[in-house]
Every structure is written in C-alpha cells, then in structure tokens.
C-alpha cells in the first residue's frame, strides 16, 4: 500500500528557461495561442503607426477560441423550422353586412411593420431596412410541414381548418345557417392525398399562402425533394480523402440512419469548401493565417538533443574558447524562448511568416553569439529557391556573421584568399581553398541555406483542397515517411548540411564539424516533424493558395505589395542557437481538427450570403436614385455587416482590417463570382428574387397628393347601408389618368421654393382637382384599420415635408419626399338608432394622400369567396416520419495519433 500511495516524481521537462531569476521548466503558452498574440501584436503596431494622425481604432486582441465556438454554434442553427401547420396568410374582418367581409393578406400587413422609416439623407438605414425585409421573407417561408392535424370524414382523411392558412372563425358567428353549411361542405372537401416524394410517403393538400412566402416554401421543398444524394456522397468522399491526408477517421454512424424508409434528411451545408470564397474577402490574408493556426496547429513541447553530443565534441577539453563551447551551457530566458517559438512559427508557415533581427541600439552583442547564430541560421532557414523564412536584411546579417566566424581562428591559423568584391564570404579558405561564396544568400537559387540544390516544394497526388496542392519538403524529406526518433535521421543528409561540414573542416573547425555531424539525426527529425505538421495538420481552406505562395518570394525581392503580404516577426541573435538546440515535438493534435471542415463550410456559406446581399444592394442606387441621393458603397457594406452574424464579422475582422478596407476592395469582392452552395444561400437568393418587386416589401413610389372628401353618406335606410358593407380607403384601385398628374421633381420643388411660390402652386393644382406625384422616391407604407374617424395626422398628412426658416436675413427651405405613408381602411358601422345625418358634418373632412399598390392587400368579398384563396399545393411529411438535419454528421470523427508519437 505504501508503494501505491507513493507519489510519482514529476516528469522533468527538457526545456528549462529563466523567467526573471527563477528557473522554470514548464512548456510555456501553447504555440497556437502564442502565435495569435505575436501576430496580432505585430499587426496592431503597424496599424497604430498608420493611424496615429487619424481616427482612433480599437486594437484589442480578439478571443479566437470564442469566435470558433460561435461559428460552431452557427452550424447548429436551423435555417428552416419544422411546424405542424403553415402560418395564417389571410384573415377576415367582420362587417355589418351578413354576406360581405374584408379579406386581409396578413403578409403585407406584417411586412409593413418591418424595418425603419426610409429617408433621403440616411442611406444606411434604407439598406438596413431592405435587408430586414428580405430576411423576413426568408424566415416567413422557411418551414417544413410535419404531422399536420387531420380528421376523418366518411372514411376520408381531411385537413383541419387551421391547416389551410385562412382565419375565418371570427366570421362564423355572424353568418346564416346556409352560409355556414356551405363553408362546412367546402372544408369537408379539403381531402388529404397520399403522395410519394423521393421514395418517402407524404401528405399533399391544397391551402392558402401569400405569393412571396410560397416562393420560399416551394424553393425549400424543392431543395429537400432533390434529395442531395450526390452532394452527400461528394461530401463524404471528400472527407475520406481529407481524413487520409490528416490522419482522421470520420464516422459514418449517422449516415446509416438516414437510409431508412421512415427518415427524411436535409443537408444544409456542403463539402468541400470553395476556397475562392474565403480568399476573395478583402485584406483577409492575416485573418486566414490566424484561423489556420487556431483550427489546425498542434500542441507540443520543445525537446533538447542528447547533452552528450556537445560534451564529447564541443566541451571535451578542460579549457574551451570557441564560440560554440561558450554557449553550450547557457539557459534561455523567457523572452528568448518566445523568440524560439517565433522561429518555429516561421518554419511552419514558410513565406507567410518571415523573420528579421531585432534592432536594439542599447544592446552590446557578444561576438560569439553572432558567430554561432550565423552558422546555425544557415542550417535552420530557407532563403530562396521557392520560398523564404527570412527577410533579405536578416539573410545578409547571417552571411556577415558566418563570415566573421570562419575568419575567427582561435585554434590554428588557416590560409584565406580574399576575393575582389568585398562582399561577405567572398574568400577561399583552407588547404583545398574551399570557395565560401557559395554560402552567400541568393534568393534566386536558394544557395547558402536549406533550399540550396533541394526540391523543397513538390506537387504529387491531388490534395483535398484544390487551391493548395503543394507539399513542403524541408531538407528534401518526404513527409509520408514514418518517424522513429531513435533511428530516424541516421545516414540521412542534404546538400547544404554537407557543404557546411566541408567548409567547417576546411576552416579548421573540426570540433564544430563533429558536433554538427552528431546533431544531424536530431536535425532531420526536427524538419521531418515540421514537414508532417505543414502537409497534414495545417492543410486547410485557410492555407495560402498556391498562386499567392509562389508569388510571395518574387514580390518580396521586388518590393511589390500584393494581397498576401508576409508577417514579419523580430527575433534575437541568441534565439537562433536555442532554436537549433530544441526541436518542436507535437504531443496533442488540435481539438478543432475534425470540426474544421464544418467551420470552414459555415464561414464560406455566410460569406456567400453576405456577397449576394451586397450585390443586390449595390443595384439599388441605380434603380432608385431619388431615395439614395447621398449613398456611397460603404453604406451598403456597413448595412450588410451590421445584419451579419457576429462570429462571421469577428473572423473577417480578426486583424482589424475593416478599418482599412476601401471601396475598391469592397466592390471587387462583390463582383467576384465565387459562392459556397448551401441551403441558406439558396433561400437567400429566392428571397431576393421575391423582393425584386418592391411592392412585396411594402415600399412604393406611387404616392400622390390629391384632395378628396371623406364620404359622409346619408342613412336613409340603415338596413340597406349595412348590407352594402360600406368602407373607405385611400388605396387606389388604379393609377390616376396620366394627363391629370403633375410630376414634381426635386428641381421643380426647389425652384418654386426659392421663388416663394411652392405652396401656392400646389394649391392651384389641388383646386383644379388634379394629382401631384412627388418624384420617384420609395416610401415606407403602413396599413391601418379603423372603425371611426382616422386621426388628423393620417387624414391631413402630406406626401412630403416642407419647412421654412429665416436666418441672417435669408429664407431657407427644406423639402423631403421620403416620408412614411399610411394606407387606412375606414369601416363604417351604424346602428338602427342613428338618424339620417349621423355621419354628416357641417364642414367636410379631406384626405390629401393617395397610394397605389398593384397588390390585393385588402378586398371586400362575399361569404362564398372566403375559401377561394385555397390554391397552393403543400407537401406535409407524415407524423411517423423522422426529419433529420445530417449536417452535423460532417464533423463526427476521431483524430489518429501519428504512428511514432
């Protein structure tokens, strides 16, 4: 028992470092977290310098983990809802007539309450209102009918009245028995028919639905009935390819269920993701880099090599004076270990993250540190050929440091023949006169660094993500090889390492050459791990596209700035030695690895929805210039962002790039054709198709000013008046005669206002019983039902606002056309006790605003026409059928450990 209770000693870490004056041995922050902090700090520093003389910007570091959780939550959101009955599309208002009622299309009634009032000087509010109305259409029609209530009538299955989409129960109490029997017979005839859709049994019935809502429902039903079997097979097949590349086994447990005959399934998202959708976003390269790190980078430890390597090569003598021997026993500080992390980040993201040396004028650099860094830097980094880990400045500084080390003859003197140029490494050294010029950095050929005479970028079998087909091969190592750290690397080598050993031997640095010869297996394991991480774990839709990757190095050399500029991180000289003496060993794979494809699909789908919204909004100014006089493209950009999910906005703005996006970036993105197919995108496009008719959004430009007297009929026969179902509305059944309409543009109104004749001119037109149409501006329309005299603001309201004021002896006038317009319906109710002149006033009441909308919002119908709107075909799934959203099956998987970890 004592042995069992004995506590195990803690495993000693192999990477001790000094944190202040305390020797720490923890592994420090996760590399992914550290990367996000360092990249954001660098980006914020550059942006802050840029914005010093302009407006302030919030540069707080975003919580990437929270953003990823929010995007996963978006995948769980249901685009459609499952209901037992459709919403009520038509309701009826009871009148005093026994055989007449008012039928109201509830869609237009509800739509009139969506959004804010449109004005000419707030284009952003106009765009936001349009988006809200479009989303209202999409939400209203995105329903799936399941287990509808039915009843049995003479052996036939009949739909319950509430399923039909018509509300008429409030009418039944005032109807005669004959009319009630007629309606009951019609209801008994609403028989449920048995249908078959995609080998599944369904109920089919005829109901009522408004046209825009039914368009969305019909599109959703067509999406489901198309089965999407091929899309599902493509997604699963692609996941299998991705799993093979990333060593992930994707579960098909859920997929065995949907094949059952009692299951209806919906696939709301598709794989693979179209990478163009993600990379077309303006100024997104840094945000995509951060997402790649957050979703794919594994966690690991920094492993030191066997200490006997240095003890038997560098420090075997009692007195050691060489630079390598001096640094052998040193311990890094916390800041220096952070620089080591930066170095490994640059190695894992070649070209995207590059390194430069810290500029610290107050630091007195030990020459030994510089010399050692110059040697190991040539063995750690790649500078040219196909990509680079370094800036041109750092490569030159490393060349100078290597030059100094070779000329530092602390053991024996070696012959040196200098060249004519005076460039670093322009000499021949040793008995065999080794030409050191070959180690001078050449970004064209990669000479002097790891890319020298090595195929470090390869294209072989097709990769799952079509935009990133490259395979990185540091030191010529194939990432498909399995790594056994105890034996891997023995007998392996590559050109730059061989030449370094030859040059060290020629320079008389035999101990150092022996050290590097012994370090070679450790060095090869290091880069074999990095190759595996890059080619397996980091392969993602957020990986830099091949064309951008291939352009990074030429652009860096030429000083050209493109869409994907590299992130430059600063490191210290001594950190190169500590990085060479430590290898990043992955211990756990990223928790988001198997969920990453679903996160990518959700993100791309939301971006596609935003792009479709912006395309349609960008056309608004050309279609309705009068309401968007002061509009700019940035207005609809902001409106779309404000109505987009917070998680998607946060990803797009990870590097605070929204503060720097210009109109050129935005319009270029909007016009690019790439989209990610999804159910949400399909419904959004259909909603915009329905919204192309602005009257379906309860917006109209057919608003007229006309003086009309409110009817005041005599009640000579109360019973007959009741039977007529008398009502009045300012809604026109047809536009007025064209020759009686005066078109008032802004220019005409301003001219008459400047002359002080605006009101007089309108009065003259009204006295002639003519009509005035104020421009072609869109107006927000509200619907109101009243059974008494409407308020004065409704009756006397004008389709414009005209304000005058005097300032400094000058008269100013303000004219606005975009005002809220109210369509009112006045229903006359009378009693038998009313006298013939009960509705008559001494002075007449006038209405001044008339509206024409080519939609049947309200109409007076006879009782036998109550169910005449049942003309839409609905498909309902039976109650015993299951409706499954199998989108979540695209993320069910298990990460496989690497065979040698």
Swiss-Prot record:
Subcellular localization, as worded in the UniProt entry: Virion
Presence of keyword tRNA processing: no
ATP-binding listed as a keyword: no
Key words of the record: Virion
Molecular function GO terms recorded: structural molecule activity
Entry's transmembrane regions: none
Coiled-coil regions listed: none
SUPFAM superfamilies for the chain: Reovirus inner layer core protein p3
GO cellular component: virion component
Similarity-based family: Belongs to the orbivirus VP3 family.
Protein function: The VP3 protein is one of the five proteins (with VP1, VP4, VP6 and VP7) which form the inner capsid of the virus.
Protein name stated in the entry: Core protein VP3
């Amino acid at each position: 028992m004592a042995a069992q209770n004995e506590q195990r000693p803690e495993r000693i870490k192999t990477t001790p470092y000094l944190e202040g004056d305390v020797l720490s041995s923890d592994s420090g922050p996760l590399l992914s977290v550290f990367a996000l902090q360092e990249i954001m700090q660098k980006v914020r520093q550059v942006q802050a310098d840029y914005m010093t003389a302009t407006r302030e910007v919030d540069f707080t570091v975003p919580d990437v983990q929270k953003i990823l959780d929010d995007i996963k939550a978006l995948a769980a959101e249901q685009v459609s809802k499952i209901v037992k009955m459709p919403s009520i599309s038509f309701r009826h208002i009871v009148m005093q007539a026994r055989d007449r009622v008012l039928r109201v299309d509830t869609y237009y009634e509800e739509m009139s309450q969506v959004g804010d009032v449109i004005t000419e000087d707030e284009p952003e509010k106009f765009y936001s209102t349009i988006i809200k109305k479009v989303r209202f259409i999409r939400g209203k029609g995105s329903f799936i009918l399941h287990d509808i209530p039915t009843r049995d009538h003479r052996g036939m299955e009949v739909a319950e009245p509430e399923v039909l989409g018509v509300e008429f129960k409030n009418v039944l109490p005032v109807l005669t028995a004959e009319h009630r029997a007629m309606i009951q017979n019609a209801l008994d005839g609403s028989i449920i028919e048995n249908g078959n859709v995609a080998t599944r049994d369904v109920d089919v019935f005829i109901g009522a639905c408004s046209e825009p809502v039914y368009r969305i429902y019909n599109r959703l039903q067509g999406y489901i009935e198309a089965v999407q079997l091929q899309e599902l097979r493509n997604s699963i097949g692609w996941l299998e390819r991705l799993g093979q590349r990333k060593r992930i086994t994707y579960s098909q447990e859920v997929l065995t269920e949907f094949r059952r005959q009692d299951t209806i399934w919906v696939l709301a998202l598709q794989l693979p993701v179209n990478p163009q959708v993600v990379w077309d976003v303006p100024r997104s390269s840094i945000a995509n880099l951060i997402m790649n790190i957050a979703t794919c980078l594994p966690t690991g430890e920094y492993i030191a090599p066997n200490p006997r390597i240095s003890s038997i090569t560098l420090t075997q003598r009692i007195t050691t004076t060489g630079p390598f021997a001096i640094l052998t026993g040193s311990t890094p500080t916390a800041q220096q270990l952070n620089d080591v992390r930066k170095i490994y980040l640059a190695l894992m993201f070649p070209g995207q993250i590059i390194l430069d040396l810290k500029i610290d004028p107050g630091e007195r650099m030990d020459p030994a540190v510089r010399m050692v860094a110059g040697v190991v830097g040539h063995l750690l980094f790649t500078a040219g050929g196909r990509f680079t880990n370094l800036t041109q400045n750092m490569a030159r500084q490393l060349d100078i440091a290597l030059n100094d080390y070779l000329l530092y003859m602390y053991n024996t003197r070696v012959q040196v023949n200098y060249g004519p140029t005076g460039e670093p490494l322009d000499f021949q050294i040793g008995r065999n006169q080794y030409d050191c010029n070959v180690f001078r950095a050449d970004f064209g050929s990669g000479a002097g660094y790891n890319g020298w005479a090595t195929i470090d970028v390869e294209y072989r079998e097709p990769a799952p993500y079509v935009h990133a087909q490259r395979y990185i091969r540091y030191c010529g190592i194939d990432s498909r090889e399995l790594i056994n750290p105890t034996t891997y690397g023995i007998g392996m080598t590559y050109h730059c390492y061989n030449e370094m050993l030859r040059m060290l031997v020629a320079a008389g640095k035999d101990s150092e050459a022996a050290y590097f010869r012994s370090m070679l297996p450790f060095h090869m394991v290091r880069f074999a791990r990095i190759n595996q991480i890059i080619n397996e774990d980091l392969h993602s839709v957020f990986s830099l596209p091949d064309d951008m990757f291939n352009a990074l190095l030429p652009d860096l050399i030429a000083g050209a700035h493109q869409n994907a500029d590299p992130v430059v991180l600063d490191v210290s000289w001594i950190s190169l030695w500590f990085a060479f003496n430590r290898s990043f060993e992955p211990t756990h794979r990223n928790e988001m690895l198997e969920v990453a494809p679903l996160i990518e699909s959700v993100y791309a789908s939301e971006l596609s929805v935003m792009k479709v919204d912006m395309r349609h909004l960008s056309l608004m100014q050309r279609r309705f210039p009068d309401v968007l006089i002061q509009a700019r493209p940035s207005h609809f950009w902001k409106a779309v962002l404000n109505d987009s999910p917070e998680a998607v906005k946060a990803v797009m703005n990870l590097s605070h790039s929204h503060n720097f996006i210009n109109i050129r970036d935005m319009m270029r993105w909007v016009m690019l054709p790439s989209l990610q197919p999804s159910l949400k995108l399909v419904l959004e496009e259909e909603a915009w198709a329905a919204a192309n008719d602005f009257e379906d959004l309860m917006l109209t430009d057919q608003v007229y000013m006309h003086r009309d007297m409110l009817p005041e009929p005599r009640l000579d026969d109360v019973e007959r008046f009741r039977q007529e179902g008398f009502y009045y509305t300012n809604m026109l059944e047809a536009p007025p005669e064209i020759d009686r309409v005066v078109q008032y543009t802004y220019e005409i109104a301003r001219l008459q206002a400047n002359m002080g004749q605006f009101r007089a001119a309108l009065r003259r037109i009204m006295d002639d019983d003519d009509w005035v149409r104020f421009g072609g501006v869109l107006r927000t329309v509200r619907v109101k039902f009243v059974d008494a005299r409407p308020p004065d603001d409704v009756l006397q309201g004008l389709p414009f606002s005209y304000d005058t004021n005097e300032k400094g002896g000058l008269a100013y006038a303000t004219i606005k056309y975009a005002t809220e317009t109210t369509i009112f319906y006045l229903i006359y109710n009378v009693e038998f006790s009313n006298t013939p002149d009960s509705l008559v006033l001494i002075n007449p009441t006038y209405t001044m605003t008339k509206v024409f909308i080519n939609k049947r919002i309200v109409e007076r119908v006879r009782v036998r026409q109550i169910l005449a709107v049942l003309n839409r075909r609905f498909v309902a799934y039976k109650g015993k059928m299951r409706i499954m959203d199998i989108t979540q099956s695209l993320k069910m998987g298990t990460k496989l450990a690497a065979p040698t970890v």
